[in-house]
Structure formats: C-alpha cells, structure tokens
C-alpha cells in the first residue's frame, strides 16, 4: 500500500474509475449480446431494433476511450453484415 498521500489518493481514484469502467463495459457487452441473440433467433426486426439501441452506446464508449474506435467499428460492421444476411 502507498505511503505518500498523493499515491493513496491516486489508488482510491483508480479503483473508482476501474469500477465505473467495468460497469460501462458490462452494459455495452449486454447490448451487443442482445443483438447476437436476436440474430441467432432469426428475427430481423428484433435484431435491427437491438442494433439501433446498441450503436450509440458503442460509439459513446469509443469516443470516451473505453474501447478503441476500430473495435467499435468492427462490432458494428460484423453485426450489420449478419443482420443483412437474415433477409
């Protein structure tokens, strides 16, 4: 454990940020899983609805630096391709 006051403060702040980021990451993954579940069920309308809910959340997390912007783009591209295959 840190002895210096500023190091103790950073440890507290880092733990707080870690918990916040974990919560946001979990929420984002849940939205992504909802899209995959709709695709697996073969329901294009539900998949599109879930995708439209997921997209701004993934973009927001990428903008804030929680995930890389290329990872966000990859998720969106892969899911869009799978939804379009449902037809």
From Swiss-Prot:
Keywords: Ribonucleoprotein, Ribosomal protein, RNA-binding, rRNA-binding. Residues 1-26 are annotated as: Disordered. GO terms for biological process: translation. The keyword RNA-binding applies. GO terms for molecular function: small ribosomal subunit rRNA binding; structural constituent of ribosome. One of its GO terms (cellular component) is cytosol. The keyword rRNA-binding applies. It holds the Pfam family Ribosomal_S20p. Binds directly to 16S ribosomal RNA. Belongs to the bacterial ribosomal protein bS20 family. This is Small ribosomal subunit protein bS20. It comes from Salmonella typhimurium (strain LT2 / SGSC1412 / ATCC 700720).
């Amino acid at each position: 454990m840190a002895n210096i006051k500023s190091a103790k403060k950073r440890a507290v702040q880092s733990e707080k940020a870690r918990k916040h980021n974990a919560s946001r990451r979990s929420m984002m993954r849940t939205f992504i899983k909802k899209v995959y579940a709709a695709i697996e069920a073969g329901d294009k309308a539900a998949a599109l609805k879930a995708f439209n809910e997921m997209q701004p959340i993934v973009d927001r997390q990428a903008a804030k630096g929680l995930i890389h912007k290329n990872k966000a783009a990859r998720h969106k591209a892969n899911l869009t391709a799978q939804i379009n295959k449902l037809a």
